[in-house]
Every structure is written in C-alpha cells, then in structure tokens.
C-alpha cells in the first residue's frame, strides 16, 4: 500500500517534472494556509534567500535561536533522503507518524487546490511548527524570492545571503535582475540582512529596501591577519 507521504511525491515537483511544476502566483499557498487556519501566524519568522549559502545560514540561525532557549523551527529544501528532513524543531525532524497523518488528512485538499509538492510540504511544515508551539521559525526560500511560495509569510526579518546567476530559465539572466528577484522578500519597515555579494547586487537590494523603509544590515566576511611565527618542538 502506498503511504500518504509517498503520495505527496505525486504532486507536481521541480525535481521530477522540471519547470512545468512551478506555477506563478500565491493563490494556492494562500488557500491551503487559510484552510489550515493560518499556522504561519503563530510564530515569528525569518525568511532566508540567496543563490548560495541560504541553507547553511538558515541552519545556523536556527541553531543559535535554539541555543538561546527559543523553541525554534527550521524549514529547508530540498531533502536528501526523506521528506522529514525539511521540517525540524530544535534540531529534531518531524515524526513520521505525524507526517503520515497530516499528509493523509490534507492530501485531497492539496489535489483540489492544485498545490505543488513544494507548496504542500511548506504548508505541512508550518502546520507542525504551530502544533508543537514553536515560537520562532527560520524558513528557506525555494527558487528566487519574489515569486516563491514562502513570500506569503509575514517575516519579521529577511536575509539575502548572496546573489549570482542560477535557474536563469525561471528567474533572471543578469545580476541586477536576479538581485531584484531576491529583494522581493523584503517586507516594509522590517530589517533585511545582506551577506557578501556583488556591489551591483547590494545596491539594487538596498535601493528596494529604502523604498520599503526597511533597515539594511550589511555584513561582510570577517578578515583576520596574524603575524608570522615559527613553531618548534622542544
């Protein structure tokens, strides 16, 4: 018998169906979150985008929040072996029995609404986070930012780790245009954190942040120099 979790893989997904699985618009994710009772509004959310480094950055942010004593959720993609890997709270994956029950309960709604696999797993992640009373969630975007399903989330802070050319058939084919896509996650009057990136990209993002009255926190790599010295064994 095919499990409910395995049936989730039958929904349209980029990994198996390519670009055809990605449909623009927020109607589907908004509809499924409304149907679930808007679990995303039960926690403070940090949204992390970037061509490279967003997954590791999101993981480190979640680890820091957990260490500080917050019950912290982490949603990432893609998974390597199991869908459970996408959903963690305080470092622990979602239990398989919960995922089976939730997938079985909501699969018909996913199909009726036409949600993609990515949208469905995002919604299930947020539902579990709310049910276990996570106070904070770090959410990694999928592709781009502006049109990504995660952009319906009212994030308290946005993070853009880097900007480079990637998925040009879906997003953009210049650094400036790609930066504009990433900057789409910036929320009005809420801070955005920038990683190390091309000056051109940083300027585009900073200009968009200014338009939205969003504070910009620009972090550069730490550089350290050490005097020359020799080690000798006595």
Regions found by a protein language model. Name each.
Residues 57-61, 122, 234:
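Short helix immediately C-terminal to the catalytic nucleophile in hydrolase catalytic domains
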Residues 1-52, 56-71, 80-81, 97, ...:
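N-terminal leader/targeting and accessory segments in enzymes
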Residues 19-26, 30-43, 67-153, 169-171:
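ATP-dependent carboxylate-amine ligase catalytic core
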